[in-house]
């Protein structure tokens, strides 16, 4: 079985998704993992494809001409004050470009809150055929494997991973 690789957007964050796709193809990657969920961080580029139809068209052309596929989108963060429906436009784009998953991480709240919100994200992603892959980040609220597994077991969603 051939190993397949995905170019993560954080590796080339200064490149919009179309350019990133051409780079991935030239470097031999099978997939790209894009960041169409804008977080509003200082200096962060905005690649909200749902709000940028021209960039989305260019991205689709790049995918079609290179054969590179979309592995996942990021980052559906769980944080206090989150309304998970804000991620719906990005999930629609993810499904439109053939992505497999939404990457998520948990950055705030008590356990009951973040389990509920992660579950809601899973529920929103499921009709699009997307899994929601929980990443634990050392500086986040859910910051180790044990905590991530606890969340996955607690939500009991078939598309949680």
Task: List each language-model region with its residue ranges.
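Acidic/histidine-rich catalytic cores of soluble enzymes
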Residues: 3-9, 15-21, 32, 94, ...
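Structural motif corresponding to the early beta-alpha repeats
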Residues: 18, 29-120, 126-131
């Amino acid at each position: 079985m051939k190993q397949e690789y995905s170019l993560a957007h954080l590796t080339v964050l200064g490149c919009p998704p179309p350019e990133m796709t051409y780079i991935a193809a030239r470097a031999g990657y099978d997939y790209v993992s894009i960041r169409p969920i804008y977080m509003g961080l200082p200096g962060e580029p905005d690649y909200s494809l749902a709000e940028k139809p021209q960039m989305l068209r260019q991205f689709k052309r790049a995918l079609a001409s290179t054969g590179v596929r979309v592995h996942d989108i990021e980052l559906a963060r769980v944080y206090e004050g989150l309304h998970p429906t804000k991620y719906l436009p990005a999930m629609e784009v993810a499904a439109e470009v053939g992505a497999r998953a939404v990457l998520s991480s948990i950055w705030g709240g008590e356990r009951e809150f973040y389990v509920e919100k992660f579950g809601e994200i899973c529920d929103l992603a499921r009709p699009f055929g997307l899994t929601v892959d929980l990443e634990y980040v050392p500086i986040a609220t859910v910051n180790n494997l044990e905590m991530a597994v606890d969340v996955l077991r607690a939500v009991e969603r078939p598309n949680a991973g």
